[in-house]
Curated annotation (Swiss-Prot):
Species: Arthrospira platensis
Protein name (record): Allophycocyanin beta chain
Sorted UniProt keywords: Antenna complex, Bile pigment, Chromophore, Electron transport, Membrane, Methylation, Photosynthesis, Phycobilisome, Thylakoid, Transport
NCBIfam families reported in the protein's UniProt record: apcB
Subcellular location: Cellular thylakoid membrane
SUPFAM superfamilies assigned: Globin-like
Subunit comment: Heterodimer of an alpha and a beta chain.
Membrane topology classification: Peripheral membrane protein
Task of the protein: Light-harvesting photosynthetic bile pigment-protein from the phycobiliprotein complex. Allophycocyanin has a maximum absorption at approximately 650 nanometers.
Organism superkingdom: Bacteria
Length: 161
């Protein structure tokens, strides 16, 4: 896992140079949003179960996927879906705090699409639920933090698509 600071420093180090104006600007932007990120993470942490619950209600609960024969029909499958959404929310929050999506590749996305396909998990419905979670989260944390979190939810969706 990297964070925005490590990413900027590593990039300059690999090139054997000091931080240039662009690198300094990236660091300034990251530090300027630090308080926003921490407040958003605090709000998300305090409301994680409700965020997931609302996202499921908005996107999956009354669809064919939860009816008999649907992929989320049994309690076990439904619980697995809730667990996965909670996992995505947690790791998107970590990535937002770090200002870098690398943790999503390392801990979430590597091999996930293939695993879902082999298990018959509907990726479209998963992406729909993540998008609903993005919307619910933005409503809680506000426009600026919601936009920042949206980057990482979208990153997960792109990795699954």
């Amino acid at each position: 896992m990297q964070d925005a600071i490590t990413s900027v420093i590593n990039s300059s180090d690999v090139q054997g140079k000091y931080l240039d104006r662009s690198a300094i600007q990236k660091l300034k932007a990251y530090f300027a949003t630090g308080e926003l990120r921490v407040r958003a993470a605090t709000t998300i942490s305090a409301n994680a179960a409700n965020i997931v619950k609302e996202a499921v209600a908005k996107s999956l609960l009354y669809s064919d996927i939860t009816r008999p024969g649907g992929n989320m029909y049994t309690t076990r499958r439904y619980a697995a879906c809730i667990r996965d959404l909670d996992y995505y929310l947690r790791y998107a929050t970590y990535a937002m705090l770090a200002g870098d999506p690398s943790i999503l590749d390392e801990r979430v996305l590597n091999g996930l699409k293939e695993t879902y396909n082999s298990l018959g998990v509907p990726i479209g419905a998963t992406v729909q639920a993540i998008q609903a979670m993005k919307e619910v989260t933005a409503g809680l944390v506000g426009a600026d933090a919601g936009k920042e979190m949206g980057i990482y939810f979208d990153y997960i969706c792109s990795g699954l698509s």
